[in-house]
């Protein structure tokens, strides 16, 4: 898989002093850090952040960057699930974001009038796999800043407690035995039956369905059945993402697989189905951190949330990942869902001075010692640039788990094909149908038809 190769290169690459050239454009030959430091200016740049869970980290980064360079970085963060809406509002203002994020080719089509060509920047030069960038013609308009992974996060201490139960109804002795949906379901349902003895309120954290908080299902979980559908369409070693981008309609042929795991989540949860419409991602991560449940679906970015919960009882060494099994044929060899969805873009409509200052900032973040320490430490990114050597890997347990899964032999990583989803409205419609289903006001056939109709109508616009 490409991402395995990417990580292997990223982690094996050794920094050489001469590898660090200028900040910003190729024509700038000064050292990246000193360039910014020597360009003290009152220019203010504006970064519109996508990820609420790391908003405080970006604030600290901005403070350090201003102290080092004199350049003020305004950081604003969109509320969960509202990035497109917030960007539309902010981009129209006089002091618009100078740095923003697009979610792949579909996002570029929405914002191409505001995306500066970045092909001549040093950061693009440092990108290990140029094919990961968002391009159009000869231009480069979005640079990925992190390779991320998601799956089912589990508390290994609770799992080991279950395996040691004398009265457990399964013959499963270790996590290695759980390699498909049937085994997962068997274990989860038995754990739920023994939840008092295990000291948990439910096996899974709450399936957050509050407005703006359903992205784990409408996007990340939906990625799995649609990845396999697009893979079928592409045939053999074809490009599943491109097949998704080309699809004007979807069959949703593996909808029952989605239903398998979604039902497992909601039937064996800390929360009753009737209250899920009020549950947030923060609620779910707090439940996991406090030991109220054994499992939660999320990605390596969730470490900052888990670690930041007051009263956190989960030890770092017990935080592990397993794949999201749904009942697909051959899923015994399935790995985590690994990819990138967030790309940095520079606003082409702001002044050249602000464009260059913005380029300088993102280059500093991924090439300077201070910036890289934030990237691998506080942000926990697995950065796809050759500026990170083997000693600069993320140290948090979830990023380590992603790296471990990427290095496994004979494991199929599930590619992030949700970049092909036609719009945020499609995702919101999907989430709305799921909420009606889980609340019992609609059946599963309604969900399937709604998803198919929404894809078709959104692609037609």
Q: Where do the language-model regions lie?
A:
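A local structural motif
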Residues: 68-77, 95, 168-175, 249, ...
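Hinge/lid segment of periplasmic solute-binding proteins
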Residues: 103-160, 316-325, 395
